[in-house]
Each structure stands twice: as structure tokens, then as C-alpha cells.
A protein has these predicted regions:
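Long, distal/terminal scaffolding or interaction modules
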Residues: 1-252
Length: 252
């Protein structure tokens, strides 16, 4: 405990386990330094390069600032009270089952991020990720770009504000989905079985069977609401220009 590390290089596994009150600066984890920090509390990592996967698990009180993950596969699992500022990460299953996260300036290349995460705020970020935010709760994303199919399935309380989203069959099976001033580009079969309150800038390619709520957009290329699957009276669709497709009752 109470360790400060500056300009260090880790080349082998498990360098910091079961530690407390750690500060690292200008430090490098090489490829074989896998599973570098587990079961550690109160740790700040600044201006570091991390080449090894499976880092940062079951940590509490973690701050990552200006950190680059060349291989972030299965990184940041089951951590609580996490702050991320200006982080670049490449790898699948980033931040699974984390709680109480505050993120600003994350650039992520990797699928299945934030699966099962809770109480997360994300700002000014770019996520290129399939299956992002699955099974998550209480997520708010602001001023960010998200691209990847099946966004947000089985989530609860997902809020997107001032975001640009590209997602095949995205935003489905969600309880309490909110979109404010968002753009949906190349997004088809959206909102299936979701309870949604969406204010969309521009058009949506297609919407399929939202369960309830209100969707406002400039236009919807194809709107499908099937009365044998959902109750059309529970969803209000407002198109500023044009709604198209079948079952589009309730357009105004």
C-alpha cells in the first residue's frame, strides 16, 4: 500500500494485486504483463501504455487518465467507483459489470462493452462496439458517437443525449429508453419491444413494434406496428415531415 510508481515497465503477470493507495505515472505494461491490477483499491493511473489484456478487475476507486490500451480484451471487469478521462482502448468485453462510472473522452474499438454495467455516465466519447450496454442499468451518454448493431438490448433506464447513433436493430427490448436531440443514421428495425421517449433529429430508416411511449422524428422510412404483437394505442408517433410503412396509426 501507499506506493508511487513513475516511469516503470511491467513485463510479467500480476504486478499489482491486493494493493491500496497506488499512483502510477508514465508506466508501461507489456504484452505478457496480463491481469496486471486485480483486487486493488484507490489507484490512479496517468499517462500510461497498457499492451496486456485482462487488466483492472474487482478494483474500487480507480482513475484512468490519458491511458492507452493496445489490447483491452476483458479489461475493467467488476470494478466500482471508476473515473475515465481521455482513454483509448481496443478490445472486446470492456467494462463488464462495473458500477458507478464517470467517463469523459473514451475512444473504444471493441464489441460487447459495458455489459451488465450500472450507474454510468459517458460524455464526449466514441464507441465502435456491437452489443454495447447489454443488460445494463441506469446509463447516460452525452455528446457521443456510437456505431454497432444491437445497441442496448435488455437494458433498463438508458438515456442518450445529443448523440449520433448507427445501429442495425438497435435500441430494442429496453425498459425506459430516452433519446434527446439524437441522430439515428443507417439505423433500421429500431425500438422493438422498447418503452421509449425519443426526440430524434433527422430521419430514421425503420421502426419496428415499440411497446409504448412517444417517438418524434423528421421522418420514418418504414414504420411497422403489428397489433397482434404490440398495442398501437400505447405508442405515439410524430413525424415532422413523413411517416411511412404499415400499421402507422398515430402519426401526426
Amino acid at each position: 500500500s501507499n506506493i508511487e510508481l513513475d516511469g516503470c515497465m511491467f513485463r510479467w503477470k500480476y504486478p499489482l494485486w491486493y494493493s491500496k493507495h497506488i499512483a502510477l505515472n508514465n508506466t508501461t505494461w507489456f504484452e505478457n504483463a496480463r491481469a496486471g491490477v486485480w483486487y486493488t483499491d484507490d489507484i490512479k493511473v496517468s499517462d500510461c501504455l497498457i499492451e496486456a489484456p485482462k487488466n483492472f478487475r474487482r478494483c474500487n476507486g480507480l482513475m484512468l487518465e490519458n491511458v492507452s490500451f493496445a489490447n483491452a480484451a476483458e479489461t475493467l471487469w467488476n470494478c466500482n467507483n471508476v473515473e475515465i478521462d481521455k482513454v483509448l482502448a481496443k478490445g472486446d468485453y470492456f467494462a463488464m459489470n462495473c458500477k458507478d462510472m464517470r467517463i469523459d473522452g473514451l475512444t473504444l474499438y471493441g464489441n460487447y462493452c459495458f455489459d451488465g454495467a450500472e450507474n454510468v455516465t459517458i460524455s464526449n466519447s466514441k464507441l465502435l462496439s456491437k452489443d454495447a450496454f447489454w443488460n445494463s442499468r441506469n446509463i447516460t451518454v452525452r455528446n457521443s458517437f456510437i456505431s454497432g448493431e444491437y445497441l442496448g438490448w435488455n437494458a433498463e433506464d438508458l438515456t442518450l443525449i445529443d448523440c449520433t447513433i448507427e445501429s442495425l436493430q438497435g435500441l430494442c427490448y429496453i425498459e425506459h429508453l430516452t433519446l434527446k436531440n439524437c441522430k439515428l443514421i443507417n439505423t433500421t428495425l429500431a425500438f422493438e419491444y422498447s418503452s421509449v421517449n425519443a426526440d430524434i433529429t433527422g430521419s430514421v430508416d425503420s421502426v419496428l413494434n415499440p411497446s409504448q411511449g412517444r417517438i418524434t422524428a423528421d421522418s420514418i422510412g418504414e414504420l411497422t406496428i403489428e397489433p397482434d404483437k404490440v398495442d398501437p394505442s400505447k405508442t405515439t408517433i410524430i413525424c415532422r415531415d413523413n411517416c411511412g410503412g404499415k400499421g402507422s396509426k398515430g402519426c401526426a
